[in-house]
Amino acid sequence: MFGRKLKLAYALAAIMLAASVAFGAGAVRAAQITLLNVSYDPTRELYEAVNAQFARDWKAKTGDDVTINQSHGGSGKQARAVIDGLEADVVTLGLAGDIDAIVEKADLLPADWQTRLPDNSCPYTSTIVLLVRKGNPKKIHDWDDLVKPGISVVTPNPKTSGGARWNFLAAWGYALKKNGGDEAKAAAFVSALYKNVPVLDSGARGSTTTFVEREIGDVLIAWENDARLSLKQFGTDKFEVIYPSISILAEPPVAWVDKVDIRHGTAAISKAYLEFLYTPGGQEIIAQNFFRPRDKTVAAKYASQFPTLPLLTIDADFGGWKTAQPKFFGDGGVFDKIYQPGS
């Protein structure tokens, strides 16, 4: 009798242990994971779509639920927030120089971060275009038209916005080529352009709002994706996209933030999240949101959406961001010298 009771007790204990293990395993499978993607201004719609698809894929693959929170603003401003303590698991910023600043000032990821993913950790590209009102009433076709008297130009502040820095360099590069490499003439051209800028918003999306919704300005210097999105949201009967004679290859990079990921226990999923951007599914979402995909098959599918034009590059034409950032946008740099509000 005693033996049977002992066996029964062991059996019950085994059942309870198995149940607890099963429950524990189930709890692991149903983990609630949260990531923070600190991004630049005009990527809201892109990452809303990316996050939803990645979460579905991750759930199917692992059983875990993942929520990706988004933070958006001017790229330089966002980099400063991370440096000052905003706990980003990943950063998806407007230019490599802003992630380099996080390396240099906060030491949150290694200096060779750009080598960890394909295409220098830039899963998509973009360029800079001109958005005008329907019918192009001011006859704006190229950079020269932006310096004409009476033209009101909307562009954000290159001190805080990554897009604004691409805008500035595209205009500078145009003027430099037109004037045979004469930097004094390029500076005079860009100075004249900024004299036509009534207000510098802190980020690209703010400038788009100023132009599109507040109806300020004759022309918006814009990310291609934001210009295309404006046509989609507000109608081709409201605006037109103008491709200038030359622009710049904008390469927005991505990186996981190692020291934050270690603290959060999110290293593996942060890496997987950014790798998803390179998959055919991720590239499809990228193209659908008017960014230029790297995948050749996806790029061919959307070729009509992305006109070809001559493009300057940050490395070949400006010596890379480590040279361009202090020269043009550092304290006392070219922008500080040519931009005189109210003058």
Region roles according to the model:
Residues 1-7:
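N-terminal secretory signal peptides that target proteins for export/translocation
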Residues 9-24:
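Bacterial N-terminal signal peptides
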Residues 30-161, 303, 339-340:
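N-terminal segment of the mature folded domain
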Residues 38-40, 132-134, 152-179, 194-197, ...:
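Short beta-strand->loop
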Residues 127-136, 251-268, 285-289:
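A bilobed periplasmic-binding-protein/Venus flytrap-type ligand-binding module shared by bacterial periplasmic
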Residues 135-141, 160, 173-181, 260-268:
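Short helix-loop capping/hinge motifs at secondary-structure junctions, enriched
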Residues 178-245:
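Ligand-binding pocket segment of bilobal, Venus flytrap-like solute-binding proteins
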Residues 261-343:
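Extracellular/periplasmic juxtamembrane helices and adjacent flexible linkers that interface
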